[in-house]
């Protein structure tokens, strides 16, 4: 996969993309990330990319010229192929694990990082295919959200994590929150690892992890359960857990 990131601050991406999983993915030719400075395509001597908004108002708006020129450059470089074009913005569609899996199936992505008050609407109407938000809050620019999207998408590319099971056990991959993890030592300051994880019985361990995943989701993000495909055993376990939590709540109220 190739991801082109259009930004006013390409240096912001050097650290996050040159460490850990993303670094290995690029070294193994599973992922290519190119950052492109929008200012390089400004048509004036001062390399400015913004101007005051028509109709008045506070702040500055990123103009269409440098972004359209930037896309012309990308098309020329990639034989007319740019792939899906994502604009990071607060009013976009919420970014989810399912969205990340969908984007990971693409060969090419372009991510546009806005700044200032916003981007000229003509860019959105003509060039952009997807608008994505990582949450109901406003950030200074689209760079940090772009990093989130790249990291989440990269994890879904086959081979990036080494083992597919590692990605499939992540929270949200199958709609549920992830089960707890433990490592050595077996006992630390009186806190012990659950005995079942030391049993070597893989079937029982798998059931325990599934139960813990259902419990965490029920306690912390119950709204997720309505969209999860549950087996008969899952439904049985959920009913037990709901009754257990109800019983505990009633005891606390007395």
Swiss-Prot record:
Q: What is its EC number?
A: 2.1.1.228
CDD domains (alphabetical): TrmD-like
Q: Which reaction does it catalyse?
A: guanosine(37) in tRNA + S-adenosyl-L-methionine = N(1)-methylguanosine(37) in tRNA + S-adenosyl-L-homocysteine + H(+)
Record's keyword terms, sorted: Cytoplasm, Methyltransferase, S-adenosyl-L-methionine, Transferase, tRNA processing
Its subcellular locations are: Cytoplasm
Q: Name one GO biological process term.
A: tRNA N1-guanine methylation
Q: Which GO terms describe its molecular function?
A: tRNA (guanine(37)-N1)-methyltransferase activity
Q: Pfam families in the record, alphabetically?
A: tRNA_m1G_MT
EC class: transferase
Q: Which InterPro entries match?
A: Alpha/beta_knot_MTases, tRNA_m1G_MeTrfase_C_sf, tRNA_m1G_MeTrfase_TrmD, tRNA_m1G_MTases_N, tRNA_MeTrfase_TRMD/TRM10
Q: What are its GO cellular component terms? A: cytosol
- Binding sites annotated in the UniProt record for S-adenosyl-L-methionine: 114, 134-139
UniProt cross-references to HAMAP family, sorted A to Z: TrmD
* NCBIfam families tied to this protein: PRK00026.1, trmD
Report the family membership.
Answer: Belongs to the RNA methyltransferase TrmD family.
Assembly and interactions?
A: Homodimer.
Task performed by this protein:
Specifically methylates guanosine-37 in various tRNAs.
Question: What name goes with this protein?
Answer: tRNA (guanine-N(1)-)-methyltransferase
